[in-house]
């Protein structure tokens, strides 16, 4: 639904929820930004990613050198960019005080990077509950998710925004 309204999916390209969200967006011709845990040349060696780039269906962004390989540290750093590029995020399952999902959500809350919503319905993890205690918004059901305004309303300007100068 969010993609059909024009929202862009920002994906860490990880297996699991990241790939499912990315695939669902692509199935309905949505836009996807991929933030890999390795250099762009490395991730582009994967046939599926390379084909999506060539078709103009995904934009890859990375703060890392093009040929850099995977490391846990880079994966943790990548999460910052996923949150920073997002207006809002949904944490489906987080470990308690460990792992990339926890670190990214915790940092996003501390830095006020993006709205952080956390699944608190059936099957919610202890990490999810703890993130709500730190300020994330609880989402106890699918209906609540859609009704909560997770999908931000488009910005409306009375006038055109001012173009800032770089130099």
Describe the role of every protein-language-model region.
Residues 1-167:
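Glycine-biased, small-residue-rich flexible motifs in mid-sequence functional cores and linkers
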């Amino acid at each position: 639904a969010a993609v059909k309204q024009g929202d862009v999916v920002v994906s860490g390209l990880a297996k699991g929820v990241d790939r499912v969200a990315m695939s669902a967006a692509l199935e309905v011709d949505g836009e996807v930004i991929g933030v890999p845990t390795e250099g762009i040349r490395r991730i582009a060696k994967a046939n599926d990613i390379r084909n999506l780039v060539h078709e103009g269906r995904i934009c890859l962004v990375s703060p890392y050198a093009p040929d850099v390989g995977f490391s846990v540290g880079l994966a943790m750093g990548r999460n910052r960019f996923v949150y920073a590029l997002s207006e809002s995020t949904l944490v489906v399952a987080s470990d308690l005080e460990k792992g990339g999902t926890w670190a990214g959500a915790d940092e996003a809350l501390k830095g006020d990077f993006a709205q952080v919503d956390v699944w608190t319905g059936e099957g919610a993890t202890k990490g999810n509950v703890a993130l709500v205690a730190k300020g994330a918004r609880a989402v106890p059901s699918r209906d609540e998710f859609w009704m909560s305004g997770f999908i931000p309303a488009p910005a409306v300007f009375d006038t055109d925004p001012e173009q800032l100068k770089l130099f």
